[in-house]
């Protein structure tokens, strides 16, 4: 994707917000680091994903010093030396956290600023915990990738409206959107991160070319049968699954929206060899099998 402007980035605005659950109300007091259960998961711990909403100064991050991360109900934005990154994010009360960046508006030719070089400290982040008024981002082993300090003030550039840099508003509706997801039904075995890493295709055969591939590096790619898309994902205990989605083309064809399925999912369970994706209320979104 070329770094042009937000008009192109917003081509599929509907998918940008598919997982942008943002919530507010910082926790008080520092909590212990999450305990790794397996690669890519952390133990349940009291967490307030709504408390992530805000503009944060990035500290103690490899090549991230001085950046500002803004998390709001309309998505994620990272302000750094490269310009302004556009993306989406998700988090849950288990302390899971994931950001996917898919657009960059900034000066062409800045060294190390290709879209493919999303900052490593952010791409490695798969969880969060409170630290006083700040937040700590951690990787899948519970090791810190960055410290977030409150009170940052991003500057609006030529491609941003003033409202896009103002302190995000946390409504009751937004808070409710971060309520704990319904547990998996007893008939499903919780999917683990290791078990999810694979290429999956929707059951039914309506769109033979549709698939989603979950990578071990936390990235995913897929197609509804004729339109490609991608994002990032993280898995946790009890079948918790969060994924971000990025832009896609809009070619019409017989399709299955597997990317949207993934972006809407809060839990993943196995019915034998079949992967079942569920929404926050426990409703079934879709079923897939290994390719």
Name each model feature, range by range.
Residues 2-9, 18-291:
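Lipid interaction determinants
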């Amino acid at each position: 994707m070329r770094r042009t402007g937000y008009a192109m980035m917003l081509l599929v605005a509907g998918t940008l917000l598919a997982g942008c659950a943002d919530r507010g109300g910082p926790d008080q007091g520092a909590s212990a680091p999450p305990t790794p259960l397996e690669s890519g998961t952390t133990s349940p711990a009291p967490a307030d994903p709504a408390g992530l909403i805000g503009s944060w100064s990035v500290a103690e991050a490899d090549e991230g010093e001085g950046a500002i991360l803004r998390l709001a109900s309309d998505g994620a934005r990272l302000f750094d030396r490269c310009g302004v990154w556009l993306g989406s994010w998700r988090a849950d009360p288990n302390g899971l956290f994931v950001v996917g960046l898919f657009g960059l508006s900034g000066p062409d030719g800045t060294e190390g600023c290709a879209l493919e070089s999303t900052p490593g400290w952010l791409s490695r982040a798969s969880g969060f915990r409170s630290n006083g008024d700040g937040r700590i981002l951690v990787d899948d082993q519970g090791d810190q990738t960055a410290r977030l300090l409150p009170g940052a003030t991003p500057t609006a550039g030529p491609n941003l409206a003033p409202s896009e840099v103002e302190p995000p508003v946390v409504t009751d509706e937004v808070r409710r959107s971060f309520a704990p997801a319904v547990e998996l039904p007893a008939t499903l075995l919780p999917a683990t991160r290791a078990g999810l890493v694979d290429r999956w295709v929707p059951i039914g055969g309506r769109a033979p070319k549709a698939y989603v591939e979950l990578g071990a590096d936390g990235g995913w790619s897929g197609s509804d049968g004729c339109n490609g898309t991608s994002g990032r994902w993280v898995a946790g205990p009890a079948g918790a699954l969060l994924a971000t989605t990025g832009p896609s083309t809009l070619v019409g064809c017989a399709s299955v929206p597997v990317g949207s399925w993934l972006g809407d999912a809060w839990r993943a369970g196995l019915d034998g060899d079949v992967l079942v994706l569920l929404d926050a209320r426990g409703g079934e979104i879709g079923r897939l099998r290994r390719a």
